[in-house]
Amino acid sequence: MATLEQRLTDLLEAPVVALGFELWGIEFIRAGKHSTLRVYIDGEHGVSVENCAEVSHQVGAIMDVEDPITEEYYLEVSSPGLDRPLFKVAQFEKYVGQEAAVTLRMATNNRRKFKGVIKAVQGDMITLTVDGKDEVLAFTNIQKANIVPNFG
């Protein structure tokens, strides 16, 4: 069965693309009474506040009609930013050579958190070089991943 995020991606990807943006990813964060649906968009030339407002208006209208989330929530539309989250295998491929912070669902080698350089992507296996050692992680076991910005 598809997760809520997967169902929302299926619902919203085509309308976001039709507006000229890439649907980078979706997070649904439950926090008591104040859940948040966060929609990340990216564009060839970046994303402006006006772009986010335009996509927010369209996404809000679709969500009102389709009503896939029955509880109350806040809708946020934003750029993924410099520390962009990675939601898809293709995004890991795009950032080979960049540093990433990864949290796993289940521990590998007695660890759940890794920070290292994305070395390679083969199928759904991500190789991360951590402290000079290669760690091969299954994409399906990744709970959360973000690019670590390099300001040097």
UniProtKB/Swiss-Prot annotation:
Cellular component terms per the entry's GO annotation: cytosol
Broad class of where this protein is predominantly found: cytoplasm
InterPro entries: Ribosome_maturation_RimP, RimP_C, RimP_C_sf, RimP_N, RimP_N_sf
Keyword Cytoplasm: yes
Pfam families assigned to the protein according to its UniProt record, in alphabetical order: DUF150_C (PF17384), RimP_N (PF02576)
Record localization: Cytoplasm
The keyword Cytoplasm is assigned to this record: yes
Domain of life per record: Bacteria
CDD domains xrefs: YlxS_C
Gene3D superfamilies assigned: Ribosome maturation factor RimP, C-terminal domain, RimP-like superfamily, N-terminal
Keywords carried by this UniProt record: Cytoplasm, Ribosome biogenesis
GO biological process entries: ribosomal small subunit assembly; translation
NCBIfam families the UniProt entry points to: PRK00092.1-1 (NF000927), PRK14640.1 (NF011233)
Role description: Required for maturation of 30S ribosomal subunits.
Family named by the database record: Belongs to the RimP family.
Identification of the protein by name: Ribosome maturation factor RimP
Taxonomic lineage: Bacteria, Pseudomonadati, Pseudomonadota, Gammaproteobacteria, Aeromonadales
Gene, per the UniProt record: rimP
